[in-house]
Amino acid sequence: MKNFISLLIAIGLTLIGITASAESNWVTDYEKARVAAKVGKKLMLLDFTGSDWCGWCMKLDKEVFSTPEFQNYASRNLILVKLDFPRKRPQTEALKNQNEQLAQKYGIQGFPTIIVLNSQGEKVGELGYTDGGPSPFLAKLETLPKS
């Protein structure tokens, strides 16, 4: 029984680590991300989401963004920016204002909406939920101009 409990604890800690590492690739500060994209010559992926209430957003996170395939691709090619509109999770006023201004700038009307910018900050694509896991989503990203 003691070994079983130890095993459950180890599995739980591993899962927490996987979730934390997937989340750690996302930033919330748009300006810092913009500079990083420019310096790194990477695309910027803006994820407009309702993380704690939007079913399609949660599905996109689970089926695409949290997968090793997407994480590996993103680490080489993307600066990931989470622009969240939660209903239950608290946010600072500065973060709320930033997210609302960006949603207005890009004409966001529903969630999830993914806006892709090139390293110069120009919009090169717009995506939503894509069925089939990370491969079809990454295939769509690959068709977008890089500069």
Each model region followed by its residue ranges:
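Bacterial N-terminal signal peptides that target proteins for export
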Residues: 1-8
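Bacterial N-terminal signal peptides
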Residues: 8-16
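N-terminal signal peptide c-region/cleavage motif recognized by signal peptidases
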Residues: 17-21
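A short beta-strand-turn-helix
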Residues: 26-44, 74
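Short active-site neighborhood of thiol/selenol oxidoreductases, capturing the structured segment around
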Residues: 41-54
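The canonical Cys-X-X-Cys-His
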Residues: 54-57, 114
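Typically the conserved alpha-helix immediately C-terminal to a functionally engaged Cys/Sec
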Residues: 56-73
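Non-catalytic, surface beta->alpha helical segment in thiol-disulfide oxidoreductase systems
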Residues: 63, 101-147
